[in-house]
Amino acid sequence: LANLEDKSSGSIKFNKDNIILGYMLQKDSLFPWLTILDNCLLGLEIKNIKTEDNISYVNHLLDSYGLAEFKNKYPSSLSGGMRQRVALIRTLAIHPDILLLDEPFSALDAMTRVALADDLYKMIKKEGKTVLMVTHDIAEAVSLSDIVIVLTKRPATLKSIYEIKFEERGTPFENRKKKEFSIYYDKIWRDLDVHI
C-alpha cells in the first residue's frame, strides 16, 4: 500500500491519479537532534516542498493540537502521547490524500491511547482525510472506524468486512459507551476465533 515494495498483483483505486500517501509508523521515529518544529518540517524538506505556506500550515497544526509552546524543544522533553501527535502532524504536513497508520497507539498506555484516538479522530475529521489504520485492538478499531476489515492469520487474507454504524457517531471515547459498540466488538471478537 505504501509503495515500499513492488506489488504482487491487484490494484488500488482512489478518486484521482498521483495520490499523496502519508505513512505513520508504530514508533514516532522523531529525530532526537531536531526540534519539534524541524521534525514536523522534515517531510516537506525531503519532498522539496518546504514553502512559507506549508511552514505556516505546520505551525497552525502545532497550535491547534496544543504543541506550539513545544516547537523549539526536543523530542526527549515530550510525553509519548505528545510525540505521537508530533508524528501525526509531520505526516499531515505533506497534505496527504490518504494516511496509512501502522498501529499508531501501540506503544502508549491505555488512557493515553484513548485520549490520542480522540485527538486523531478530531484531526482527521477537521482535515478531511482518508485513513487506513492497522490495529490489533478491537475497541480502537470499532470506536474509530467507519469500516473494519478482519484478516485471517498468516498469510493474511480477507475474512470479514464490518461497516460500523452508530445511531449518532461521536468521538472514539463517546462511541465506546454506545450499545452498538459492544455488538460490533463481540462480533469481531468471535470472528477472530480467540479462545480464553
Where are these regions (language model features)?
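Helix-to-loop junction immediately C-terminal to a conserved catalytic motif
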Residues: 2
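Conserved ABC transporter NBD signature motif
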Residues: 9-19
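Short coil-to-helix segment of the ABC ATPase nucleotide-binding domain corresponding to the Q-loop/switch region
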Residues: 34-41
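Conserved ABC ATPase "signature" region
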Residues: 41, 52-70, 122
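Conserved signature/switch motifs of ABC ATPase nucleotide-binding domains
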Residues: 73-76, 94
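Catalytic Walker B motif of ABC-type/P-loop ATPase nucleotide-binding domains
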Residues: 99-102
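Helical segment within the ABC ATPase nucleotide-binding domain
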Residues: 113-127
